[in-house]
Amino acid sequence: MNKRDLLINKAYEDAIPFLDAYPNYDLSSLPFWIRDNINLARVSGKTKKSIIMPDGKRYNLLNKLNHLSGQEWTYYINSVFCTRYPTKGKESYAHNIRKIHPTPKPPQLMRDLILFFTKEKELVFDTFMGVGGTLLGAAMCNRRAIGIDLNSDYVNAYKNAAKELKLKIFPTYVGDSIELTANDVKLNDILDGEEISLLLIDPPYGNMMSMKKTGADVEVYGKRATPFTDSPCDLGNMGREEFLDALKKSIQNVMKYIKKDGHVVVFIKDLQPKGKKINMLHYEVVCKLNEIDDLNYKGMRIWADESAKLYPYGYPFCFVANQIHQYILIFRKEK
């Protein structure tokens, strides 16, 4: 037995059984990994707020955000992380169905974000759901979710993916998310009186997808543009300023339904610089959304998708980056 194991054993032996310290505690509020092994759980410290399990895994009863141990929490706040999610076979999570969307987010990625910003059974809302990566991710970790999208084909693809994966199919709505969320009667009906713990969105990034393809994308789509829809309400068909204003409006509409200390998490990718235009879209989004009352920017995580195909952009004349990363911008509702 090494030194670490000895320290864990000593800490566990010195702690008292959880049920002795909290005989009337609502066990349903505990993480499943404690709840399912409650007879092994112990509490330590003067305040008896730290739960310790036989393997040394700990959970603090003051944690109002999620059901993670301290060690898991540390992993999830890493500011830069890389993944290589498969796009074939069982581990692709029905990518064969979801690939009708030009940029489907991996359900495993969305699940991991949801795990940090919610507790079990809390509500996740996605107003730009696409083919449902957020909803699939929520189902994978015992959360609830609701989604909206303009494109009925994408919504149907989500339902088919959920069926194939044998995951719960959550409520979905087809329509303009800004129009739907601006209608309090309709939004109250959609949410059914529930508070939102996490608004998790991957909006179309301005008119990026409406441009002709270059580089590696040509192999998949040809040179044609691949807009998400032809609708003028689609953020993906808007110019920069119109896009930023529409994105801000989409979040403002939902703010009063987000719980205090709830989070808004937004995926954004920069455009390539052009002349004197630096095109740091993530910075512009942070500034625009930080204008919303009671919503504060808390930081970002940078996701690098190592499965993205590389292409010699600019060769042999100048540097042009292969942008395999996206910014995950994190905001919190303070009041």
Model-derived segments and their meaning:
Residues 1-335:
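Class I S-adenosyl-L-methionine-dependent methyltransferase catalytic core
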